[in-house]
Amino acid sequence: MHPAELSPATQDYLKTIWRLGEWEPERVTTTSLAARMGLAASTVSEALKKLTAQGLVTRPAYGVVELTAEGRDVAVHMVRRHRILEMFLATELGYAWDEIHDEAEVLEHAVTDRFIDRVDAKLGHPSEDPHGDAIPSRDGVITPAPAVPLGDVTHPEPVRVTRVSDESPETLRVLAEAEIRPGAVLRVLPGPDRSATVRVRVAGGGTTPGGDVPGGSSPAALATQGPPDVAGTAASGGVTVELGILVAEAVWVQAFTHAS
């Protein structure tokens, strides 16, 4: 089934179900789906009945929602459109990274596959969007870099930011102010137990709003490189910032691994 055969609302439901399961370990539920979409649970339940009848989702347990193979194909197709459009808006039209999500939400339902393929080629077939999320290939393959939430990091070694959630424009503005973007090097600093904030030292090296990384490397490629001199920039340079827990939860990082 091609997304063009479905309504924009159906496309949004399938994409949102997929995105909820992309980074969160918990199963997608009617409640979590309603919260993410800003709709009443009763409205979502009615929509899910229709999606189930269309063979796009299943309900394996009470309140639990899963995509069928056909539903996943549609969802990933829409995710690809969305993320390529975000890159286009940022790199070609100069949109800030806190503006591109809402614009792409509108455009993704109006453009054709041919247009998306042309834009993808124009951009050089990027592997990530400006927020660091992996862009699915034309045949639906997606390979996100392994990452953990910044708030889960307890060791003092430097880590590289691999992606930032685009759900909150305000959070993106806070992180941009702190120069925390995909590719940035961070070190979590000690703080009191049960603190409502996370203190980090930002050593720089992040991408621009358009996703460009100094030196021409993508955030995914940078994750395979070694950290900067630990006795220098990553250890003692940079700026120390204090992030609220909700802001820190929007940042996903990866430990450095040295290329063999």
Model regions and ranges:
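Mid-protein regulatory/catalytic core that forms ligand/cofactor-binding pockets
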Residues: E108-I245
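Extreme N-terminal segment that seeds HTH/winged-HTH DNA-binding domains in transcriptional regulators
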Residues: M1-L39
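Key DNA-contact positions within bacterial/archaeal DNA-binding proteins
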Residues: S42
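A short, conserved structural fragment
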Residues: A53-P60
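Basic, amphipathic "hinge/linker" alpha-helix immediately C-terminal to the N-terminal HTH DNA-binding motif
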Residues: G63-H82
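Short, hydrophobic-biased segments on the C-terminal half of alpha helices
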Residues: L48-K49
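Ordered, amphipathic secondary-structure segments that act as subunit-interaction surfaces
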Residues: R80-I116
